[in-house]
């Protein structure tokens, strides 16, 4: 599945949420996509070319949903996410 096709229902299903509001899920999707953009330097079109980014969005959404704390540990990026994003990274700084 392409990242541009990810919707609130698919994320809620992945998170196994029975009772949810769109206002809770939309910021997670937006933040996950922004993280991919800033980490890789890829455009929306380039991101859609790689279907492995679908799982990255889902994992990031789950991580943000499960770890809603005031001071997150910034040095603790999921290995799967780090590996997939690293494979497609354009900005190597």
Go through each PLM region and give its residues.
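Divalent metal-cofactor coordination and adjacent catalytic microenvironments
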Residues: 1-93
């Amino acid at each position: 599945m392409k990242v541009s096709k990810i919707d609130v229902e698919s994320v809620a299903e992945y998170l196994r949420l029975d009772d949810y509001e769109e206002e809770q899920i939309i910021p997670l999707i937006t933040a996950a996509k922004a993280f991919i953009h800033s980490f890789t330097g890829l455009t929306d079109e380039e991101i859609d070319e790689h279907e492995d980014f679908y799982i990255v969005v889902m994992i990031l959404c789950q991580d943000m949903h499960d770890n809603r704390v005031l001071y997150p540990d910034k040095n603790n990026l999921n290995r799967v996410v780090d590996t997939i994003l690293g494979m497609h990274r354009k900005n190597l700084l």
